[in-house]
Each structure stands twice: as C-alpha cells, then as structure tokens.
C-alpha cells in the first residue's frame, strides 16, 4: 500500500490547542509533558504495526529537547492536492490530518496519529523534523505550530525513516524536567506489546546519564513472564492465544500462579485500557466457558463442589490481553475503556476456541489449575457465608463501630479524616492531641495480616482488619462502595523504623487488593512524623529528613554547637499529645505523602515481591532499594 500525500485527510485546524492544551494531552503537568513523547512514539509504533518499522530510538538531549527516530517509511513530503502544501507540513500543522483517517494507510493505529504530532508541534517552542524518503533527506522547522522554514532537501539517503526533535514550550508546561524512569516504563511496555521491535531510550542530561534497550522476541509471553517472575507458577511457560476475526487481531498471554489475586492487563492498539471494556468482558466469558468445559470433561470428582464461576478461574491468573481494532470507540477522554460492542463476541470466540486446544494439549497442568479453582470456589462460599453472618451482626455497619475507634463529631465525610495508628501508646497520644471535630483515631495492635498469602474468606473475618472495614463503612472486596465511605482522608501513621515500614506495606497491600478505589481516588495518605527534634537558642525545631537536619546544623557556628540538644525519634510513642499534634496532625503544619498508582503494573509487582512467597526476589528488591526505601511510593 502506497503512503503518499493523497492518503492524508484534513478534518479541522489547530487553533484551540495552545489555548486549551489540557483537552488534548490531559494536563500541563509532567504527565502532559510525557504525553508529548508518547504521541511522537505512537506515530513510529503505527509504522511498526503496519509492518514498515522495527527500530525506535528516544533521546533526552542535554537541552531538554526530545528526539524520536524510527526506520519507517518516512512522513510523505509531496504536495497535498486539496491543501496545496506538503503532506509533511500538513501532518504537523493541521489537527486530524494523518494517515490514520484513511483506512488504506493504517488498518490499526495507536495514539492519535496526526492529531498527536500536530498537537506536539503546537505545544513546542521549537520542532525540527528530518524525513529520509525517496533517496533524499528532507528537513522542516516549526515554532509553536507555525512553520519557520519550507520543506527543503538537505542531502541524499539510502534508508527511510523519520527523526523528530522538539522542545516543549516553557510558557505552557509547569516543568520541562522529564522523568527517565516513567518514559522507560512506557517504552518497555510498548516493546512487550509489539514483539520483535527494538526500542531504546537514552538520557544525555549532565548528572542523569543512563540508557535502556528493549527487544522481546516473545512479545506478550515475555510480558506475562516479567509480571510473574517473582511468583510460583503452575505452568512451565505462559499459554498464548493468537487469532483474528474481521480485521480484529486478538493476542492473549495467560499464566496461573499460587497467588490468591488476579492481575489482568488489557490494551487496545497499545493503549492501556485501565477500566477494561468489551474486550475484557469477551476474554472473561471465553475463559469461563472453556474452563467450565474442561472441568466438566475432567476426571475430578464433582461431588460437593459449588458451581465454578469466572472469578474462581481467575484466582492466581496473570493475563495480558492485547487487541488491535481498526476503529476503536473509547469511552471517556482518557481512552481507558473500550466501548465497541462487536469486540466482546470476537474476543470470546478467539479465547474459547484457542483455550480448548491448549486444554487438550496440557491436561496435567489444567487439572492443577482446576484444583485451584475448586479451592477458590469453596473459599468464595465461605466468604459469602461470613459476610452474611457479619451483616446480621452489623459488624460492617456504622451501628457497630469498633470499641477502640475514637470517632470525630463532624458528620461530613468530606472534612472527616481517620488516623490508623500503630500501637496503643501512640494511639493514646493521638486521641488526646487530635482535633476531635474532624479527626478520628483507630489504634492497631498485634500482628497485621498479609493479604497476599490469604484468601478472601480469611481476610474479611480477620480480627485486625474488621475494625478498619467497619470504621470506613464502605464494605470490602466486591461489595466495596466508595459512596458509603465515612472519611475522605485515611492516614496511616506508623513509626519511622523497619516495623513501621512493614505495617505500612501490609496496610497498603490490603487497600490495594480489597479497596483499590481508595488509592485510585486519592484517599490514602502516609503520615510523616519528624525524625529529629532539636533544641537551640530557647527554640524547638523539628526535622523530617536527614538532609534538612544536617543543613540546619551546618548553619550553626561551631562554638555554639555545645548548646544544641538533639533527639532522634524512634517511635510515635516518644511524642506527647501536643508534640504529635504540632508535628504530625495539624493540617497547617503536618507533612503527608499521598498514595497513588501512577503505574499499576509496577505496584502489582512490588506487592507480589514484598509480600509473596518467594524469598530470593524479596531479598534482591530490598538490597537494590535499601537506600531509597524511605521514598518508596506505591
């Protein structure tokens, strides 16, 4: 298929982009800055999906410009008949002017192709593009979306491809400081989803020099292996499904582990569909249908076994679903949920038919997986009975709030906050030091449950977790309803030592598995009590970081240092109620860390590594991150 100027169609102009950048890239924060890089890379990925590109290089240059190079066909440079300008200039200056809008050019497209690169141009103070095509090297430059040069031939070339260099506009973006790790993770994800494509990233900034290269022969199978390499698996390698119906390509990798939770990632045209959609619904129904058939035909005794559901078959399952759809319909501006109704049946048929073949070829492994599903079904029944029993006793309702909870008087969830505090002594100080109008205190005691190693029926009846579930008032697991939440700030307050860190991680794992909406909606915080108290010159100073304390000490003349009194806080219990209020609980002065899931894939891996059964991966992770553990955000 030829890719020339006539393939480029124009829908409308670029005027609004600089006025309302958030409508096109989500925000003007660092997330929007990274979005510019993704849009340019997505154009190169489109060439790869069409079979014309197998290498993409991304460079963060010394001056904070970004360069993206691919070996695709090169953007067309001939004159567009309708517009009377070169296709290259058209693609970079007109919104909705890309090969994506002509079905013959790209059957499927990630990113916005045309929308994306023109938006990048509009939001860059400088953009330069080189095109290797038709034996020549073409060049054109732009500023804030406006051409500053004509398309000119600057040399000869025996290869094809496109090189884009841009400088994001400092008048629009809050920062131009790219985060290498964030970009690296996205490029690694793209390399997993598009097998046999070489993708590299290099940071040339002084003091930040590093680079990574990705190439995965196994594609999605490699992705599943990466996600499960810290878990005990039932299979020697992932099962792989590859099929297509009506130009829709379906690729799925599956692997069952001994975990009690599932991890299903879904993508449409390389876009992470975090909210799922019709492709995920089709996967679940195809999986359930095939596995029920496998159970029916197996020699496993059917006596006293509850009906097996999709949730039972999903226990311990890690799956990556990737579909390529010619005309995807995404619900919402963020492209996080697929809406095409026809995709559900297509994915269901492909998954069902291919999974039946896999089942026939792997009878022993499938029997083991079915055995796990049966245990999950029995645990599900036990959890249902436990819920009903607890419901009858009002254990999860506000009428039966735990005795240790010191509640606040405000009835407005928007202003109410609850401190979940490690230890009775610290809980006592917190109760006395708090503002009783809007601050509630729930002390924790004893050993906290590790939910990564526990089935749901044991979780919802655990005597350490029931007080948390009851206090929050919104249910747990599948019955969790965030609209019933009694507090809009949930603050974990624990000692700044190894035990405190362990308790924080256990609580975060519980919220991640059973109340993930709390993290995704920004309701979970970590309290940051001070590490040091210094008395000097009749004044008291509190310091929350080692470097803050050192900077303060360095500012004091040597002759006066004998008059300094320094205390290192080992635990919350060392502070009296007034000190705890002033340093850790007063909204005007306290420091807290908001927990969020910028990267759900990495969050999943971290919890499995830290809380799972395998010791070696946990040891490696701790050794690699020991120096950064205070800054570990999940």
UniProtKB/Swiss-Prot annotation:
Lineage of producing organism: Bacteria, Pseudomonadati, Spirochaetota, Spirochaetia, Spirochaetales
Organism from which the protein derives: Borreliella burgdorferi (strain ATCC 35210 / DSM 4680 / CIP 102532 / B31) (Borrelia burgdorferi)
Quaternary assembly: Heterotetramer, composed of two GyrA and two GyrB chains. In the heterotetramer, GyrA contains the active site tyrosine that forms a transient covalent intermediate with DNA, while GyrB binds cofactors and catalyzes ATP hydrolysis.
Identification of the protein by name: DNA gyrase subunit B
Source superkingdom: Bacteria
Enzyme class, first EC level, given as a word: isomerase
Primary gene name: gyrB
Catalytic activity annotation: ATP-dependent breakage, passage and rejoining of double-stranded DNA
Disulfide bond sites: none
Known role: A type II topoisomerase that negatively supercoils closed circular double-stranded (ds) DNA in an ATP-dependent manner to modulate DNA topology and maintain chromosomes in an underwound state. Negative supercoiling favors strand separation, and DNA replication, transcription, recombination and repair, all of which involve strand separation. Also able to catalyze the interconversion of other topological isomers of dsDNA rings, including catenanes and knotted rings. Type II topoisomerases break and join 2 DNA strands simultaneously in an ATP-dependent manner.
GO cellular component: chromosome; cytoplasm
Extra remark beyond the main annotation: Few gyrases are as efficient as E.coli at forming negative supercoils. Not all organisms have 2 type II topoisomerases; in organisms with a single type II topoisomerase this enzyme also has to decatenate newly replicated chromosomes.
Entries under InterPro entries matching the protein: DNA_gyrase_B_C (IPR002288), GyrB (IPR011557), HATPase_C_sf (IPR036890), Ribosomal_Su5_D2-typ_SF (IPR020568), Ribsml_uS5_D2-typ_fold_subgr (IPR014721), Topo_IIA (IPR001241), Topo_IIA-like_dom_sf (IPR013760), Topo_IIA_B (IPR000565)
Gene Ontology biological process terms, A to Z: DNA topological change; DNA-templated DNA replication
Molecular function per GO: ATP binding; DNA binding; DNA topoisomerase type II (double strand cut, ATP-hydrolyzing) activity; metal ion binding
Cofactors: Mg(2+); Mn(2+); Ca(2+)
Subcellular location as annotated: Cytoplasm
Amino-acid positions noted as binding Mg(2+) 2 in the UniProt annotation, renumbered to this chain: 495, 497
Residues where Mg(2+) 1 binds: 422, 495
Site feature location: Interaction with DNA: 447, 450
Major subcellular location class: cytoplasm
Domain Toprim: 416-530
Record-stated family: Belongs to the type II topoisomerase GyrB family.
């Amino acid at each position: 298929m030829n890719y020339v100027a006539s393939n480029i169609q124009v829908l409308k102009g670029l005027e609004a982009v600089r006025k309302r950048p958030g409508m096109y890239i989500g925000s003007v924060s660092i997330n929007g800055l990274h979005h510019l890089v993704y849009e340019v890379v997505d154009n190169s990925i489109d060439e790869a999906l069409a079979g014309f590109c197998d290498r993409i290089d991304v460079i963060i240059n010394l001056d904070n410009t970004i360069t993206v190079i691919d070996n695709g066909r090169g953007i067309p440079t001939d004159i567009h008949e309708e517009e009377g300008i070169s296709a290259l200039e058209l693609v970079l200056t007109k919104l909705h002017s890309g090969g994506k809008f002509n079905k013959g050019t790209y059957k499927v497209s990630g990113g916005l192709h045309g929308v994306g690169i023109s938006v990048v141009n509009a939001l860059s103070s400088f953009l330069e593009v080189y095109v290797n095509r038709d034996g020549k090297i073409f060049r054109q430059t732009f500023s804030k979306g406006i051409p500053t040069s004509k398309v000119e031939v600057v040399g000869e070339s025996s290869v094809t491809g496109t090189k884009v260099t841009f400088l994001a506009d400092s008048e629009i973006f809050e920062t131009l400081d790219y985060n290498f790790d964030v970009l690296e993770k996205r490029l690694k994800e793209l390399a997993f989803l598009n097998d046999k494509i070489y993708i590299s990233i290099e940071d040339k900034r002084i003091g930040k020099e590093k680079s990574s290269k990705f190439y995965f022969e196994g594609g999605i199978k490699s992705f599943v292996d990466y996600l499960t390499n810290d878990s005990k698996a039932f299979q020697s390698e992932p099962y792989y499904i590859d099929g297509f119906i009506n130009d829709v390509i379906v690729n799925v990798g599956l692997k069952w582990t001994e975990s009690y939770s599932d991890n299903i990632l879904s993508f449409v045209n390389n876009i992470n569909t975090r909210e799922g959609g019709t492709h995920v619904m089709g996967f679940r129904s195809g999986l359930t249908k095939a596995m029920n058939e496998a159970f029916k035909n197996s020699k496993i005794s059917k006596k006293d076994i509850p009906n097996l559901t999709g949730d039972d078959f999903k226990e311990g399952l890690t799956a990556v679903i990737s579909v390529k759809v010619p005309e995807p319909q995404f619900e919402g501006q963020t492209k996080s949920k697929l809406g095409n109704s026809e995709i559900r049946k297509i994915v269901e048929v492909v998954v069902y038919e291919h999974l039946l073949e896999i089942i026939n070829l792997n009878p022993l492994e499938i029997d083991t997986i079915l055995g796990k599903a049966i245990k999950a079904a029995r645990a599900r029944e036990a959890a249902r009975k436990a819920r009903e029993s607890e419901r009858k006793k009002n254990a999860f309702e506000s009428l039966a709030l735990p005795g240790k909870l010191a509640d606040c008087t405000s009835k407005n969830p928007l202003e109410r906050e609850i401190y979940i505090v490690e230890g009775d002594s610290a809980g006592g100080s917190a109760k006395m030091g708090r503002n009783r109008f809007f601050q509630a205190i729930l002390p924790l005691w004893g050993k906290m449950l590790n939910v990564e190693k526990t089935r749901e029926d044991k979780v919802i009846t655990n005597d350490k977790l029931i007080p948390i579930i009851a206090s929050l008032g919104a249910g747990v697991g599948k019955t969790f309803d965030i609209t019933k939440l009694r507090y809009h700030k949930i603050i974990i307050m624990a000692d700044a030592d190894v035990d405190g860190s362990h308790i924080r991680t256990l609580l975060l794992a519980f919220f991640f598995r059973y109340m993930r909406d709390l993290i995704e909606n920004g309701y979970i915080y970590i309290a940051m009590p001070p590490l040091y108290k210094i008395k000097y010159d009749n004044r008291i100073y509190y310091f929350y970081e080692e470097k803050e304390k050192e900077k303060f000490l360095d500012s004091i003349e040597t002759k006066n240092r004998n008059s300094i009194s320094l205390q290192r806080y080992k635990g919350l219990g060392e502070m009296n109620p007034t000190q705890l209020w002033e340093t850790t609980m007063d909204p005007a002065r306290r420091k807290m860390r908001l927990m969020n899931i910028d990267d759900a894939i990495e969050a999943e891996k971290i919890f499995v590594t830290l809380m799972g059964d395998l010791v070696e991966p946990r040891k490696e992770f701790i050794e690699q991150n020991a120096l950064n553990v205070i800054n570990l955000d999940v």
